[in-house]
Amino acid sequence: MRLHRLRARLSAVACGLLLLLVRGQGQDSASPIRTTHTGQVLGSLVHVKGANAGVQTFLGIPFAKPPLGPLRFAPPEPPESWSGVRDGTTHPAMCLQDLTAVESEFLSQFNMTFPSDSMSEDCLYLSIYTPAHSHEGSNLPVMVWIHGGALVFGMASLYDGSMLAALENVVVVIIQYRLGVLGFFSTGDKHATGNWGYLDQVAALRWVQQNIAHFGGNPDRVTIFGESAGGTSVSSLVVSPISQGLFHGAIMESGVALLPGLIASSADVISTVVANLSACDQVDSEALVGCLRGKSKEEILAINKPFKMIPGVVDGVFLPRHPQELLASADFQPVPSIVGVNNNEFGWLIPKVMRIYDTQKEMDREASQAALQKMLTLLMLPPTFGDLLREEYIGDNGDPQTLQAQFQEMMADSMFVIPALQVAHFQCSRAPVYFYEFQHQPSWLKNIRPPHMKADHGDELPFVFRSFFGGNYIKFTEEEEQLSRKMMKYWANFARNGNPNGEGLPHWPLFDQEEQYLQLNLQPAVGRALKAHRLQFWKKALPQKIQELEEPEERHTEL
């Protein structure tokens, strides 16, 4: 009897020690373990420069089944369970994509290459960065990052959430989603409705709702944020009926759901292009999908190569109607949002990566016309649209430097500034909206880019994450360091409270009837009515001129 009691006591002690060990690993251990609904994950403890707290990282956690075989061009399915402890110490494979243009036109300027991750169709993973002290019950705000890349490239390993997590005491989640043809091909019918990449994002957010408490996060305080096509994704999630309730705030950096070239009402154009590129010349959409499912990784990469960007579609599921209609609908219920742009969005990165024009050469009228034609094709806009834009932005000007600045403003307004302002106007009467214009050119880029540059597309990212391309440390000036800390606090305060303002920060007013916005520069200031005269052109003059041009054509057709 005594022996039985002794064994029971020893067993209880052993269980207690094991429980303490697991709890220790879950918090301060160099080899932390956390539990998800599909199994345990081993992470790493990272010591963050400039922060008192360490951060635990859990990389490459599956949030869906690998989208292979019959799951290619199909909605994501829940992940399968695993036994034992899964290794979460290395980045996941990136989704299939063509990296040639980005590496040759952009990263080469910094003598850098992409992180040496493998590339695979099996890529539906997310990574988590959580303060080392966090535990289930910490209820920390959660910030889910959606990367940009024109919906054709990008990866989780390009971003490091450690600094944001450590300095602002938040849980950062970075997700991957299918890209290019695998992510957004559609036949426009039941055989391939499309928007697979967007559905992946929804699946990742559902996973966060189920599991983030195990990593110290609060599932009732989730903010989604993204840049460029990531901002478009965030904005699209805000209007989509199937993602409601999965997040509670949204930050759209240089990209919204109305960005031309990233949304199409019809799948016809992309479907036809893909059919031609793939040599799947079947007229029947079911046969076309079957043919594409049989293509190898190398063949899919070859089909992807010509796409510099690819649009989502009105699929009846994720987007039951065009985002503009959803934004204007009476039943639209947005979440509090930060919406913003940079003041030189088309200055350097996009023209280089998309090879629109030579950024090192002076631009004459002929070069501007050729560049405009390339952009109209990419953005799927009619030639008459381009003529009206040239008339408004460029006129008869022939001075090369002025011409280039006018062309850059025209394209930045078309793609980013005007759509962002339109979304802000749609949302601000129904939920709080905070608008910003980022204006600072990073000091470390001044020797690489033309001297007239301001804040280019993506320039705000190192200030939000306090790192550059996969965690590379940046040498900020002291003033830039202060700007970065302000921006991190604004973003994290918004994730905590739905309001970016806080102690020690310059006041950021709501975007409302007065159209006030924050100018994010070394000395932040409040501005008012950004691009007011251009917005009037886009809202009133341009639609009226297009209608006037279309009316004679309609009369001619009737005759």
Curated annotation (Swiss-Prot):
Pfam family of the protein (one): COesterase
Localization in the cell: Endoplasmic reticulum lumen
Glycan-bearing residues: 111, 276
InterPro entries (alphabetical): AB_hydrolase_fold, CarbesteraseB, Carboxylesterase_B_AS, Carboxylesterase_B_CS, Type-B_Carboxylest/Lipase
Gene Ontology CC: one annotated term: endoplasmic reticulum lumen
Family recorded in the similarity comment: Belongs to the type-B carboxylesterase/lipase family.
Protein name: Cocaine esterase
Organism, scientific name: Homo sapiens (Human)
Gene label: CES2
